[in-house]
Structure formats: C-alpha cells, structure tokens
Amino acid sequence: TGRYAENVYFGKPSGLMDQMACAIGGMVYIDFENEEKPQVEKIDVDFEKAGLTLCIVDTKGSHAGLTHEYAQIPVEMKQIAAHFGKNVLREVEEKDFYAALPVLCKESGDRAVLRAIHFFAEDERVVKEVNALRAGDWNRFLKLVKESGDSSYKYLQNVYVSRDTVSEPVAIALAV
C-alpha cells in the first residue's frame, strides 16, 4: 500500500523502506530479496534505557528535485548487475564486482560503480547493526550508523542534487 501510494499517487519510483518502518514502528530489519513479500523483523530497542534519545533534525533540506536522482539508484545498480548477467546486484558476487571495476566504470559510469560499492558495504553493515542492537552494543551501533551516513554521502550520493551544489544542507548535517 505504501509503495503503491508513493508510486501512483505521488509519482515517485520508491516507497519500500520508509513506509515499512512507519507501519511496523521502531527499528526494523528488512530483507528485500522478495520485493513482493519482504522479510520484516522488528528489533526491540530501548533508547531511554541506553540513555539515548532519537531525534529528527530539521536540516532545512528538501527532497524537491531528488526524484530523478533517487530513481537512478536502482537503474544504475541494475546496469551493474546486468554486466554479470544478473537482474539485481545482490545476485552478484562482491569479488567479481571488484575484479571488473575498470570495465564497469567504462560501461556504467563512475557514479553507478560508487553506488554499487555502497550497496555491498551497506548490506554487510546492516547485519552488523542488527547484531549490535541485539547485543545492546550502542557504541558499535552508532559507529556503524555514522559509517552508513558517510557511505550514503560519498558513494550512494543520495543527499544532494548533483546539479545544485550551492544548497547542500543534508550534506552539512552529515558533516557535523
């Protein structure tokens, strides 16, 4: 339903993670191997007990102008996967991806390759984050979240519009 609303009503080619997390509530682990029936697991955490408060920061940033940028993420990941005869990047062996870097940069461009680098690292990082939460290791979890934000900024490149380098408030928020 969330994806349908995002795709059809709002005309945006996204809509899986945010809506799923909102519907379940709290921290969730989502595996999208089967997009029609993703595996969703609620991770019970107690921020208060850990002495933490979850805050949403108003960066004054906007998603305006980012629809095309977001839409290119799966397109570029699928371009990389297609090089290996696969439909999606999760079907590609990471070692094979790295062995083919020069060719992939020529075929799909550097941004697509950087986004794929993020994908491989993020898939591993998510498992580590979930394990840290289950173990109550908040320092490890927060370190991994910071790594994720840094990777999103540098490799996934989904925090700013590439043609508007004057206004990058989300990038500023990640930096501080």
Language model: regions and residue ranges:
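Glycine-rich, mobile lid/loop segments that gate access to catalytic sites or pores
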Residues: 1-19
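C-terminal nucleotide
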Residues: 21, 26-176
